[in-house]
Amino acid sequence: MKPNFSKGLLPAVVIEEGTKEVLMLAYMNEEAYEKTLKTKRTWFYSRSRRSLWNKGETSGHVQHVQSLYLDCDQDAIVVVVKQVGPACHTGEKTCFHYKII
């Protein structure tokens, strides 16, 4: 089973393997998805820069991919990782650190 990239980018929810905590949300195109499969490290597509980026390439806070899941419509991806260091560029463990309710 493969993701359906016919409509473009797919959301990729990244979660920590042990805790299942949501670390971040990013987007993948088909090339980022294939590079993620090949390298077992996360690759995403930057909508603002319009280019691929490898999580942790600059910071060293890499994500080692343990498994990938597709939703029932094959248009969203869950990436289960072992995170090295914080996931958020702000230095927080997760990008979802602002509690609303």
UniProtKB/Swiss-Prot annotation:
Binding-site residues, Mg(2+): 71, 73, 75
Q: What is this protein called?
A: Phosphoribosyl-AMP cyclohydrolase
Q: Which organism's genome codes for this protein?
A: Bacillus cereus (strain ZK / E33L)
According to the UniProt record, what class of enzyme is this?
Answer: hydrolase
- Where does the record place it? Cytoplasm
Tell me the cofactors it needs.
Answer: Mg(2+); Zn(2+)
Task: Give the record's cofactor note, including how many are bound.
Answer: Binds 1 Mg(2+) ion per subunit.
**Keywords assigned by UniProt, alphabetized:** Amino-acid biosynthesis, Cytoplasm, Histidine biosynthesis, Hydrolase, Magnesium, Metal-binding, Zinc
Q: What cellular component terms from Gene Ontology apply here?
A: cytoplasm
Q: Name one GO molecular function term.
A: zinc ion binding
Tell me which EC number(s) this protein carries. Answer: 3.5.4.19
Enzymatic reactions: 1-(5-phospho-beta-D-ribosyl)-5'-AMP + H2O = 1-(5-phospho-beta-D-ribosyl)-5-[(5-phospho-beta-D-ribosylamino)methylideneamino]imidazole-4-carboxamide
Q: In which pathway does it act?
A: Amino-acid biosynthesis; L-histidine biosynthesis; L-histidine from 5-phospho-alpha-D-ribose 1-diphosphate: step 3/9
User: Which function does this protein serve?
Assistant: Catalyzes the hydrolysis of the adenine ring of phosphoribosyl-AMP.
Q: How does it assemble?
A: Homodimer.
Q: Which InterPro entries match?
A: PRA-CH, PRib_AMP_CycHydrolase_dom, PRib_AMP_CycHydrolase_sf
Q: Which family does it belong to?
A: Belongs to the PRA-CH family.
So where does Zn(2+) get bound? 72, 88, 95
**Gene3D superfamilies, per this entry?**
Phosphoribosyl-AMP cyclohydrolase
